[in-house]
Amino acid sequence: MKSILFSLTLVFTALACFAQDYYGNNRKQWLQKAEQYKPKLIITEKKPLKVVDIVPDTQSFQKYKAVDVSPIDSLYSMPFRLKKEITIDFGEHLTGYFSFSVRSTGLAADGPLRFKLTFGEVPSEVAVPFDSYKEGLSRAWLQDEVVSVMYVPQTVTLSRRLAFRYVKIELLGSSPYYDFNIHDMKCMAQTSAKNIPEELPQAVDPMIRKIDRVGLNTLKECMQTVYEDGPKRDQRLWIGDLYLEALGNNYSYKQHDLTKRCLYLLAGLSDLNGYLLATVIENPVPRAQDKQFLYEYALLYNVTLKDYLEATGDMETVKDLWPVAKKQLDIVRTNVKADGLMDFEKVKKDWWVFFDWKEDLYKEAPLQGVSIFALKESYKLAQLLGKEKEVADLPALTNKMIKAARKNLYNRKTGLFVGTGDKQISYASQIWMILSGVASKAEGKKALSALDTTQNVCYPGTPYM
């Protein structure tokens, strides 16, 4: 009997050790700090400017454009029942909650109304029906809603947050015995971005100034209570988007508490083994998406932490999160081969290797590049913290991996970087070899120039790349 109990004790002890949390009690206080730095949303009432028609136009983006019809006030005084359908334009992209009011014009309302509302960021979204959508992601992400108004007059506020500029309103059902107006349409727009970034100097090319304004507005819309990868879809925090958005914030809005919140959230919701999960879903309560291990995102956390320290000088926070950054380095250490090349096949089995939404992208060279980049940036972080001794192996490992990349991945004749298993020439390979410093400035310039004259180049699939 004693031997059985002893055996059971060993089993349970082993299980407990197996399930042990790498960060222990730190997790709780990290999540508390994440909540502490949750920003207050700034709510601004925005009203539509005009009624528009969406018409086909081969010269416009996605083949549709908006044509002005009348000021918005004309809609508010017009009986709507015979109109049936109308599109309004807010004049700018907004993220927030839409509402409208209805009132009868004359006879008392004797029945309910039903509307279909379609929201679009660009004209084509409200022009092309969603019926042909083949579900890959949830159909519910598409921004259309059927609304029944049981009593008139009434004000209706949609419960879902929307990201849009245009709204198409279609009347699906009404009583033939009374007419009504739609009026007082508005969006309670929200963002946590409260500071006003400096504009580029007037001497800068006007097109660059326009691009900068659009980029800043896009960042503002993504700055909610985390850096969202997109305010329309999928309204969550991804480490890769955090890296880019926080970097932009460092030079524009400079609201570093949002970055701090995201860094703490990701740390607090990391896997029990200490590795970061790529994405956090914030509502109804923050939670990480289980088993979502994304190779380069885990490493980019370290870079974001280093950038945050350089922007803020907040040693306390960064020292608090240093154990997380240090743990992510094991991802490289355990996957680099004796010759200094990353074990691409092994990494693919154990991790999601992303880089871009591009199915035919061969990722061996980008993997080598981002690994070197992350090691370099992590060592800089260690130097800023006075923690070099804790990662004393990094300089030698980095140099070994750089030499391996130049020996095995660089074609001196063409000036381009390619993989060992596939000779595909891609923008991703050149970009990550340049960012990592494997390529010199002259070599980087040559590689990017060569892409313009090389056939069968694998181009970026998305703006993220």
List the predicted regions and their residue ranges.
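Bacterial Sec-dependent N-terminal signal peptides
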Residues: 1-21
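A broad, structure-centric signal for solvent-exposed, well-ordered loop/edge residues
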Residues: 8, 12, 124, 155, ...
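Generic N-terminal helix/loop capping motif
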Residues: 14-16, 218, 252, 269
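Alpha-helix N-cap recognition
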Residues: 17, 122-124, 314, 441
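Extracellular/oxidizing-compartment recognition motifs
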Residues: 20-229, 241, 278-282
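Active-site core of glycosidic bond-cleaving carbohydrate-active enzymes
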Residues: 238-253, 257-465
